[in-house]
Amino acid sequence: MSQAISLTFPDGSVRSFPAGATGKDVAESISKSLAKSAVAIAIDGAVRDLSDAVTDGKIEIITRKDGRALELIRHDAAHVMAEAVQELWPGTQVTIGPVIENGFYYDFAKNEPFTPDDLPKIEKKMKEIIARNAPFTKQIWSREKAKEVFAAKGEQYKVELVDAIPEGQDLKIYHQGDWFDLCRGPHMASTGQVGTAFKLMKVAGAYWRGDSNNAMLSRIYGTAWADQADLDNYLHMLAEAEKRDHRKLGREMDLFHFQEEGPGVVFWHGKGWRIFQTLVAYMRRRLAADYQEVNAPQVLDTSLWETSGHWGWYQENMFAVKSAHAMTHPEDKEADNRVFALKPMNCPGHVQIFKHGLKSYRELPIRLAEFGLVHRYEPSGALHGLMRVRGFTQDDAHIFCTDEQMAAECLKINDLILSVYEDFGFKEIVVKLSTRPEKRVGSDALWDRAEAVMTDVLKTIEAQSEGRIKTGILPGEGAFYGPKFEYTLKDAIGREWQCGTTQVDFNLPERFGAFYIDSNSEKTQPVMIHRAICGSMERFLGILIENFAGHMPLWVSPLQVVVATITSEADAYGLEVAEALRDAGLNVETDFRNEKINYKIREHSVTKVPVIIVCGRKEAEERTVNIRRLGSQDQVSMGLDAAVESLTLEATPPDIRRKAEAKKAKAA
């Protein structure tokens, strides 16, 4: 007699089921309504088909309301789309169709590429397939059978995929009616469970296996959600994101541009560079009390990168150079043929600075900060404005401390990161601890100690925030050289951006032989903590532009005020107003052109000037100003002195404002 299966339910109850019982059987044993709404099961956290036989462990019944169902909905939608394409265009080959963030795609081999006009036809056919409600059924095929069947269908890409599957691994074939595909699964019970909350978004070209030497395929992107409301919200967010696109706003605001001769590197215009320098100046002030700002070389011999390990595990992302003479005159035996690398990271340089001279435990912690320009190779297709570049500035720091100082340093870093984000208006922050990956350096004892310290720090962060900061664990997601905190912030339209990190490093100090002299006069390896707040300054600026939709806070804006006159009779007074604001430290331009005032206001609104001061005869006579804010129809009239005082306060960076307020409070 077969042994019974023991299942533990989320409420802690334990029940036995006969061997061979499926997930659907378990759901039906609870209620018919649950069985009807169930789309899959999870055994010990692993999502499986509802039709799979259950095994001993902790079971969860997954319904469409479960967040994990979203990946299944999108996965199944990709299969339905592939079937729809082959019904509409027989002879089209299917290749791969994974789930991606917020959706899915499928790559097809088709004689003529898809056009946007094809998408509504495919959507209509998908709805027909969903209405058929064909069950997803799974079969295990032999390698020979799979190759034979797919070859007979003319699916050469599937034959290649079968060959790539390791020997001894099951080949799963999922059927939905007469259509089938090679797939690892899992899937929901039927095509009907996909629902109709989906939309095909765009078509694109893609090389097979991402290799430009291979055939160009035709890719269709789609999105799918649990219900129509979620789909509508997502489409609204996309529309908002398009309006906020920093590349579009960057052109309108005359901040920066890119060009073919420098792919992935920014050409900063005057206004854009002013914002960049404002961010750097702000960060520099925030670090002044606790950090030494250093600067390590951008170009270093590859021998250093071999020692650090970057040349071995990061080489494909690095740029290497040698002298132009050596490259163009290989026959010259006297030429310097050494190969140098543009630094992709600042950390090895900071270790060299720490190592220069003997360090005592009494000097620790030593905190080295740098606004270091780094270069990393990115495929041209992955480049995306300021968000994904090849050359960028990191607000990097490395703390060298004792084991006992690690917790206090991590908390100090956390306080600084959260304070910076708050100054830029970000309130919703998530802090997650990434723990040891399978492949790593350092002993288990070192990892145990570091993870224990960082777990306690995470608990302290959560407790101190009184619920304002969300925390979590990312098992196995740590760097190979140590555990790390990841800081993710949410912007004005709900998108999440991972920016800050705090990483413990067991690797570099050992590789470079870094040490300090401890209280017993022994050489001891320091704990090294990598820390970034903005991460890439360029990317953070892009996030700010999109978060504020170009309506930058006055203290960040490159051009803070435009003084525009209604009549030439007010030009002299307008100049006086502009000079008063400039004397107070604001960035001001004047617009005394012979144009209508509404035209001037519209023009400066397009370039996102936050404050427009309008001066006419009345204002000149009364020594007042008329203030108009970007995005508002309201007008505020006030005296010149009061306006200067008010705008000066608003244009003062928050860190400077806090210091002034604290000084004032102390004096009182």
Curated annotation (Swiss-Prot):
**Catalytic EC class:** ligase
According to its UniProt record, the EC number is: 6.1.1.3
Keywords attached to this Swiss-Prot or TrEMBL record, sorted alphabetically, are: Aminoacyl-tRNA synthetase, ATP-binding, Cytoplasm, Ligase, Metal-binding, Nucleotide-binding, Protein biosynthesis, RNA-binding, tRNA-binding, Zinc
Question: Which positions are annotated as binding Zn(2+)?
Answer: 347, 398, 530
Instruction: Outline the extent of the TGS domain.
Output: 1-64
Name the PROSITE patterns for this protein.
Answer: AA_TRNA_LIGASE_II (PS50862), TGS (PS51880)
What this protein catalyses is:
tRNA(Thr) + L-threonine + ATP = L-threonyl-tRNA(Thr) + AMP + diphosphate + H(+)
What note does UniProt attach to the cofactor annotation?
Binds 1 zinc ion per subunit.
Q: What GO annotations for molecular function exist for this entry?
A: ATP binding; metal ion binding; threonine-tRNA ligase activity; tRNA binding
Region called Catalytic, residue ranges: 245-553
CDD domains attached here?
Answer: TGS_ThrRS, ThrRS_anticodon, ThrRS_core
Q: Which GO terms describe its biological process?
A: threonyl-tRNA aminoacylation
* Classification via SUPFAM superfamilies: Class II aaRS ABD-related, Class II aaRS and biotin synthetases, TGS-like, ThrRS/AlaRS common domain
- Give one Pfam family, short name only: TGS
Entry's localization field: Cytoplasm
Tell me the superkingdom of the source.
Bacteria
Described function: Catalyzes the attachment of threonine to tRNA(Thr) in a two-step reaction: L-threonine is first activated by ATP to form Thr-AMP and then transferred to the acceptor end of tRNA(Thr). Also edits incorrectly charged L-seryl-tRNA(Thr).
* Assembly: Homodimer.
Stated name of the protein: Threonine--tRNA ligase
Species: Rhizobium etli (strain CIAT 652)
Q: Name the encoding gene, please.
A: thrS
